[in-house]
Amino acid sequence: MLQNYLCVAAYLFCIGIYGLIISRSMVRALMCLELMLNGVNLNLVAFATYLDNQEIKGQVFAVFIIAIAAAEAAIGLAIVLNIYRNRNSVRVDQFDILKW
């Protein structure tokens, strides 16, 4: 049973990495980053359930990761929205704002 959860978690994480490498849109990159964090959450919960059913350490870490991911998504989308207002594009290859 643990192997099924770990395979799904690894699959989610790999899809997130692939999307992060391939995507040219910042919004899509943020979505892929969230997918990677969901794979990590599934991994933590699966190991916590498999190793010790009585303690909820893995679930607590997963809740913290979900909270951090929500803050990361809000800040990331605010940055993307600000860049879109200034540049009219959210493509990563056209992002040269930090160049002087």
UniProtKB/Swiss-Prot annotation:
It comes from Zygnema circumcarinatum. This is NAD(P)H-quinone oxidoreductase subunit 4L, chloroplastic. GO terms for cellular component: chloroplast thylakoid membrane; NADH dehydrogenase complex. The chain crosses the membrane at residues 2-22, 29-49, 60-80. It is a multi-pass membrane protein. GO terms for molecular function: oxidoreductase activity, acting on NAD(P)H, quinone or similar compound as acceptor; quinone binding. GO terms for biological process: ATP synthesis coupled electron transport; photosynthesis, light reaction. NDH shuttles electrons from NAD(P)H:plastoquinone, via FMN and iron-sulfur (Fe-S) centers, to quinones in the photosynthetic chain and possibly in a chloroplast respiratory chain. The immediate electron acceptor for the enzyme in this species is believed to be plastoquinone. Couples the redox reaction to proton translocation, and thus conserves the redox energy in a proton gradient. PANTHER family: NADH-UBIQUINONE OXIDOREDUCTASE CHAIN 4L, NADH-UBIQUINONE OXIDOREDUCTASE SUBUNIT ND4L. It catalyses: a plastoquinone + NADH + (n+1) H(+)(in) = a plastoquinol + NAD(+) + n H(+)(out); a plastoquinone + NADPH + (n+1) H(+)(in) = a plastoquinol + NADP(+) + n H(+)(out). NDH is composed of at least 16 different subunits, 5 of which are encoded in the nucleus. Its main location: plastid. Keywords: Chloroplast, Membrane, NAD, NADP, Plastid, Plastoquinone, Quinone, Thylakoid, Translocase, Transmembrane, Transmembrane helix, Transport. Belongs to the complex I subunit 4L family. Its EC number is 7.1.1.-. It holds the Pfam family Oxidored_q2. It is found in: Plastid, Chloroplast thylakoid membrane. NCBIfam families: PRK05715.1-2, PRK05715.1-3, PRK05715.1-4, PRK05715.1-5.
